[in-house]
């Protein structure tokens, strides 16, 4: 089967004592398939928001490679970003707005990553969705908006999102592994002749 690699190859060190060994790159979800290779030891693999691998999870034998389905990619263009205070604390959360006429592909508990060209101070990585507007006119806005548990830590100092700058919110995931012994787990998103999308 032909594979078209997407993004970078990442590596985890696997061992028998920790099922919480996770990828540190918090991978952007760009295809519906993840190719994994176990080197030095077999491993159980878990994929998710903050996964923990156990012996109940998918197993790949030492020296073998497999392609695991990730499900459909979820991403949406962002047209507005604001911060809101959390009552009784010094913290804030982030509200992102999507274009009118579109909806949110994200649900409560999803991990998301925001990328903004030319305004990278708005960027954040692998933060959790804690609220999704369901009204057709939430607080006077006709855009669908979601609330994300992301605190920039700088109050309201950022310059507003520039309309001509591209901003995208995309789902992200982490990989965890529990090895039969000390080894390496290599993984990379791929597009394949079977129809992986991105």
PLM feature spans:
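Short, intrinsically disordered N-terminal pre-domain segments
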Residues: 1-24, 186-198
């Amino acid at each position: 089967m032909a594979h078209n690699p997407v993004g970078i190859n990442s590596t985890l060190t696997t061992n028998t004592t920790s099922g919480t060994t996770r990828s540190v790159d918090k991978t952007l979800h760009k295809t519906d398939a993840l190719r994994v290779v176990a080197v030095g030891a077999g491993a159980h693999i878990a994929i998710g928001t903050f996964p923990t691998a156990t012996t109940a999870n998918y197993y790949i034998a030492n020296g073998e490679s497999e392609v695991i389905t990730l499900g459909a990619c979820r991403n949406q263009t962002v047209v507005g970003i604001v911060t809101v205070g959390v009552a009784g604390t010094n913290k804030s959360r982030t509200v992102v707005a999507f274009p009118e006429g579109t909806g949110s592909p994200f649900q409560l508990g999803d991990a998301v990553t925001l990328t903004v060209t030319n305004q990278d101070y708005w960027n954040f990585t692998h933060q959790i969705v804690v609220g999704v507007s369901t009204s057709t006119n939430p607080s006077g806005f006709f855009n669908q908006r979601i609330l994300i548990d992301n605190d920039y830590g700088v109050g309201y100092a950022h310059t507003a999102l520039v309309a001509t700058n591209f901003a995208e919110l995309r789902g992200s995931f982490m990989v965890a592994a529990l090895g039969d012994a000390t080894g390496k787990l290599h993984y990379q998103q791929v597009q394949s002749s079977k129809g992986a999308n991105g």
